[in-house]
Amino acid sequence: MSIGLLCCVAFSLLWASPVNAGVTQTPKFQVLKTGQSMTLQCAQDMNHNSMYWYRQDPGMGLRLIYYSASEGTTDKGEVPNGYNVSRLNKREFSLRLESAAPSQTSVYFCASSE
């Protein structure tokens, strides 16, 4: 690879603009003791109507916890027990673990769609 090409690539990366995040979940990582509660926040910047919370346990596929077809409405998914949700506006959909249990150790995903 020539020096000219290498410098061009480095320069292009320095001037790259940020990309829209789409869906943002916070916090990214969390460890809880049994019985503790916490809220996972999800925000989307794509003006989508529908939002979803999923969990993925080791060796399993995604399982729907709750979903919302529009702001102010929520419906239970496949595994809603132990969770509550809130969708006060089009952009945000929060998931609350009321009392953490070892069975809730999982990877959590938020998604949105038209």
From Swiss-Prot:
GO terms for biological process: adaptive immune response; cell surface receptor signaling pathway. Transmembrane segments: none annotated. GO terms for cellular component: plasma membrane; T cell receptor complex. InterPro entries: Ig-like_dom (IPR007110), Ig-like_dom_sf (IPR036179), Ig-like_fold (IPR013783), Ig_V-set (IPR013106), TCR_beta_variable (IPR050413). Residues 22-114 form the Ig-like domain. Glycans are attached at residue 84. This is T cell receptor beta variable 6-1. It comes from Homo sapiens (Human).
